[in-house]
Amino acid sequence: MRLERLAVNKIKVFLTFDDLKERGITKDELWQDIPKVHDLFRDMMLEADDELGFKADGPIAVEVFALPAQGMVIIVTKGHQESDFDEDGLEDGYIEMQVTLDESDEVFYEFADIEDVISLVPRLVTLGMTGGTLYSYQGRYYISFTDLDLDGIDEESLIALLAEYGYPSTISTYRVAEYGSLIIANDACIKLYQSFFKART
């Protein structure tokens, strides 16, 4: 389980499928109202309090994103009781959760710096990955891999490499493509490799 603060009232939690498996939870059960899911959310909130000082002391909205071969990203947002959420059900200190489930068919990763992307590229090329589309948006960098890009690639190894340098993105590719800047449309990995590494040999 990895936690990251996105804003004063918002955190991102990344759970691998191993994290879920250890608790006997499938991705389809994650949004269901069952005791083991309650236990998971309680543990998440305790860890968020310990690590980030994020206290779930009122209504929260929970967005769950399923990422293929990667795990689940959970966005937890605290609401303002007066406006964002209905106050019904809060009398007993119950945490109200509004859950949204979304599933993506692509691999889409976010990086803090272009240097992270450049450092990653030779390792991806060694793995056989030549494709991908590179974007920038709000000072961060994003790589998208389609099913065609992933054909013949060991996805577990790919995800392990990507996770060393970046994070699964919870922003959709559509948003980044529409509001961000397209840097390399196709074959981003091999083009970056040829630009930054082949010239040195």
From Swiss-Prot:
Keywords: Competence, Sporulation. The keyword RNA-binding does not apply. One of its GO terms (molecular function) is protein-macromolecule adaptor activity. The keyword Transcription regulation does not apply. It comes from the Bacteria. Gene3D superfamilies: 3.30.70.1950. InterPro entries: MecA_C_sf, Neg-reg_MecA. Pfam families: MecA (PF05389). GO terms for biological process: establishment of competence for transformation; negative regulation of establishment of competence for transformation; negative regulation of sporulation resulting in formation of a cellular spore; sporulation resulting in formation of a cellular spore. HAMAP family: MecA. Belongs to the MecA family. Homodimer. The N-terminal domain has binding sites for ComK and probably for unfolded/aggregated proteins; the C-terminal domain interacts with ClpC. Enables the recognition and targeting of unfolded and aggregated proteins to the ClpC protease or to other proteins involved in proteolysis. Acts negatively in the development of competence by binding ComK and recruiting it to the ClpCP protease. When overexpressed, inhibits sporulation. Also involved in Spx degradation by ClpC. This is Adapter protein MecA 1. It comes from Halalkalibacterium halodurans (strain ATCC BAA-125 / DSM 18197 / FERM 7344 / JCM 9153 / C-125). The lineage of its organism: Bacteria, Bacillati, Bacillota, Bacilli, Bacillales. The gene is mecA1.
